[in-house]
UniProtKB/Swiss-Prot annotation:
The keyword Nucleus applies. Belongs to the WD repeat PRL1/PRL2 family. PROSITE patterns: WD_REPEATS_1, WD_REPEATS_2, WD_REPEATS_REGION. It comes from Arabidopsis thaliana (Mouse-ear cress). It is found in: Nucleus. The DWD box is required for interaction with DDB1A. This is Protein pleiotropic regulatory locus 1. WD repeats lie at residues 174-204, 216-246, 258-288, 300-330, 342-371, 384-413, 433-463. It comes from the Eukaryota. InterPro entries: G-protein_beta_WD-40_rep (IPR020472), Prp46/PLRG1-like (IPR045241), WD40/YVTN_repeat-like_dom_sf (IPR015943), WD40_repeat_CS (IPR019775), WD40_repeat_dom_sf (IPR036322), WD40_rpt (IPR001680).
């Protein structure tokens, strides 16, 4: 028996043009301009939205009745206590015999009333002319109603201490290239400088006379540090080398190998035999001084590590980089503790205050102060040194100095962030005007002398002006109008 056949419905043949027109019509229905228009405004929804906004803004304040208060009957009613301050009147005057109600100034809560939009009137059940601010309202509503009573920022900003201006009293010449680094001896008898001429020179602090020249690097020397626990000096340069010098023999006794590119900064731990170096390979390396072994490779930056310091009290390392960040590292585990992203430009210089638990960092956008050990942001310096800042230092008296790439040297009051002196270095004869940059700065152990290393191949020494007084050099200080929290 043959299987039943099913009839297939004929499909109407459609031309390609008809199909394309059908698709075009469907697209117009979906994407026509009518669908992109907003619906007509709904008055009821608009009224609900306005009432909600008014409730949020003024819900914590009881409205004041716009009706005038009822005048009391002064003939039959005895005068009672009122919310008024009576003016003093001459003795025997008629006003004193009537309860002093006519010569009174009503002190109402008009200062605390919210400013209502034009055309909006509030009515309430209470007839008293007082403003009630509940304790459970939000801080925004409380600040809205008491903004006129808030204390102004300039009155709370610390006033800077007076500091004598600094002057250049000595220029030392001897290097054949840019002077890139400086470090002082713990005994405060000499200091050493590293230069682009690949030499390290040791100078007498009192006279500025050259005492010794050390050679060993094959590129410019960018970092120097003198140990206060050993007779060692450490140097780092663009030749990827970190060297330990014995100052009794005046020769290299150890070399630390591991950096993949130039080494830009160097620091010693104050209490441990640990050396910290940062370089162009974006890594801060921690070395054991005695065994020459690398303890940690603190990797996490995305660009050159150009500044580093550590503290004696906490196992903490702080690094600044060209990637605009400042990182806190735990020296016990070699891990990142936190990252500060306040700067917008390269953090080329940092300095630790010798007494306070705080440090400052300098960038081309601003100079900022942070607290330790958590790195909480304190404030910006009140002026902006509009240049690339390569060097900064601070002494125990609270005088911070920053040196720029254009030869500008600014002196700051640490507490308030006020710049009390803005100077320019003088390029020595034979140098170009563009060689007015400052690459390194360091105070001596007393904080009374400052050494700057500059691009005109000279070393300049600064000290305070002995003849300056607060009368001859007054403080020109204007407190900021607002506090920037970034």
């Amino acid at each position: 028996m043959p299987a039943p056949t099913t009839e297939i419905e004929p499909i109407e043949a459609q031309s390609l043009k008809k199909l394309s027109l059908k698709s075009l019509k469907r697209s117009l229905e979906l994407f026509s301009p009518v669908h992109g228009q907003f619906p007509p405004p709904d008055p009821e929804a608009k009224q609900i939205r306005l009432s909600h906004k008014m409730k949020v803004a003024f819900g914590g304040v009881e409205p004041v009745v716009s009706q005038p208060p009822r005048q009391p009957d002064r003939i039959n009613e005895q005068p009672g206590p009122s919310n008024a301050l009576s003016l003093a009147a001459p003795e025997g005057s008629k006003s004193t015999q009537k309860g002093a109600t006519e010569s009174a100034i009503v002190v109402g809560p008009t200062l605390l009333r919210p400013i209502l939009p034009k055309g909006l009137n509030y009515t309430g059940s209470s007839g008293k002319s007082t403003t009630i601010i509940p304790a459970n309202v939000s801080s925004y509503q409380r600040n809205l109603s008491t903004a006129a009573l808030m204390e102004r920022i300039p009155s709370r900003w610390p006033r800077p201490e007076w500091h004598a201006p600094w002057k250049n009293y000595r220029v030392i010449q001897g290097h054949l290239g840019w002077v890139r680094s400086v470090a002082f001896d713990p005994s405060n008898e000499w200091f050493c400088t590293g230069s682009a001429d690949r030499t390290i020179k040791i100078w007498d602090v009192a006279t500025g006379v050259l005492k010794l020249t050390l050679t060993g690097h094959i590129e410019q020397v960018r970092g120097l540090a003198v140990s206060n626990r050993h007779t060692y000096m450490f140097s780092a340069g663009d030749d990827k080398q970190v060297k330990c010098w014995d100052l009794e023999q005046n020769k290299v006794i150890r070399s630390y190998h591991g950096h993949l590119s130039g080494v830009y900064c160097l620091a010693l731990h104050p209490t441990l035999d640990v050396l910290l170096t940062g370089g162009r390979d974006s890594v801060c390396r921690v070395w054991d001084i005695r065994t020459k072994m690398q303890i940690f490779a603190l990797s996490g930056h995305d660009n050159t590590v150009c500044s580093v310091f550590t503290r004696p009290t906490d196992p903490q390392v702080v690094t600044g980089s060209h990637d605009t960040t400042i990182k806190f590292w735990d020296l016990r585990y070699g891990k990142t503790m936190s990252t500060l992203t306040h700067h917008k430009k390269s953090v080329r210089a940092m300095t630790l205050h010798p007494k306070e638990n705080a440090f400052a960092s300098a960038s081309a956008d601003n100079t900022k102060k942070f607290s330790l050990p958590k790195g909480e942001f304190c404030h910006n310096m009140l002026s902006q040194q509009k240049t690339i800042i390569n060097a900064m230092a601070v002494n125990e008296d609270g005088v911070m100095v920053t040196g720029g790439d254009n030869g500008s040297i600014w002196f700051w009051d640490w507490k308030s962030g006020h710049s009390f002196q803005q100077s320019e270095t003088i390029v020595q004869p034979g140098s170009l005007e563009s060689e007015a940059g400052i690459y390194a700065a360091c105070y001596d152990n007393t904080g009374s002398r400052l050494v700057t290393c500059e691009a005109d191949k000279t070393i300049k020494m600064w000290k305070e002006d002995e003849n300056a007084t607060p009368e001859t050099h007054p403080i020109n200080f204007k407190p900021p109008k607002e506090i920037r929290r970034f």
